[in-house]
Swiss-Prot record:
The UniProt record lists the keyword ATP-binding: no
Assigned keywords, A-Z: Metal-binding, Repeat, Transcription, Transcription regulation, Zinc, Zinc-finger
Protein name: Transcription initiation factor IIB 1
Record-linked Gene3D superfamilies: 1.10.472.170, Cyclin-like
Source organism (scientific name): Halobacterium salinarum (strain ATCC 700922 / JCM 11081 / NRC-1) (Halobacterium halobium)
Chain segments carrying region Disordered: 40-63
Length: 287
């Protein structure tokens, strides 16, 4: 068994310094250049308030290269000739960073996903999942003949569906740069070819948001949950719009407790027609 403080060549004594371990007898350098885990003392930025650091941004799946690429910075201290030189270098560097049309499309799709995620205030974890889903669809060749915007919106919608975040197709389509048919076509392709773990949406997931939009108290929401459970027991939820079921149960609960909520207001919150809402209301009142 080799002793940690003995030379592996001559079994001599190891002399330790700040930067290396050297054998005192034969001069063999056993280890050198250890990792310095201490702080950085120098700054490489023109900003005097910038914290001295060598590390960049953390790795993220919301960037086409996971954030590993570098950038050529700007400086006001350069002369005109050097400024033009670095402008050319920056242009060539950007071309090298995006070598293919597929990378360019991925950058555009990820940018659209980040915009949609910011619009709905969804967390960065779901953002990374949506970007990963978009990249998987691109790798599988699903984007051929379809719009990038549609798949970006479909990635956000699919991520919301698989994580229990209640966002309807119409809500996503209203904020996206894709039409609703483009979104549904892309989502159907993802669901079919990628095998998304999506199941039926529980109408109860919509109740907190709809109750807040209609300014209804918590007890109305609790009563609406009981009405949803009653519809499920009678088998009247399967095959119906879960958003409309949630709005219908809230409207019914509000009506039974004399809260002033109109059918049109409840339908508008759920983005359904009053006819859809009345169907749920009729099922509950006939029960």
């Amino acid at each position: 068994m080799q002793h940690p403080h003995r030379c592996p060549e001559c079994d001599g004594t190891i002399r330790e310094t700040d930067t290396e371990h050297v054998c005192a007898d034969c001069g063999l350098v056993v280890t050198d250049a250890p990792i310095d885990h201490g702080p950085e003392w120098r700054t490489f930025s023109d900003d005097p308030d910038h914290a001295p650091e060598r590390t960049g941004a953390p790795l993220t799946r919301s960037r086409h290269d996971r954030g590993l690429s570098t950038e050529i910075g700007y400086s006001a201290r350069l002369t005109g000739r050097k400024r033009r030189k670095f402008a050319r270098l920056r242009r060539q560097h950007k071309r090298a960073t995006i070598p293919s049309k597929a990378d360019y499309n991925r950058i555009y799709g990820f940018t659209e996903i980040r915009r949609l995620i910011g619009t709905f205030g969804i967390g960065t974890g779901l953002r990374d999942q949506a970007c990963t889903l978009f990249a998987s669809a691109q790798t599988a060749g699903l984007l051929h003949g379809r719009t990038i915007e549609g798949f970006a919106a479909a990635g956000v919608y699919a991520t919301c569906r698989t994580n229990g975040v209640t966002r309807t197709l119409d809500e996503i389509a209203a904020a996206a740069r894709a039409t609703r048919p483009e979104l549904t076509t892309a989502y159907d392709a993802m669901n079919r070819d990628l095998g998304l773990p999506t199941g039926p949406i529980d109408p109860r997931e919509y109740l907190p948001r709809y109750a807040d939009a209609l300014s209804l108290p918590a007890r109305i929401e609790r009563q609406a949950r009981e009405l949803v459970a009653a519809l499920e027991t009678d088998g009247l939820v399967a095959g119906r719009n879960p958003s409309g079921v949630a709005a219908g149960c809230l409207y019914t609960a509000a009506t039974e407790t004399d809260h002033a909520v109109t059918q049109s207001a409840a339908a508008a919150v759920a983005d359904v027609t009053p006819v859809t809402l009345r169907a749920t209301y009729q099922n509950l009142t006939d029960a």
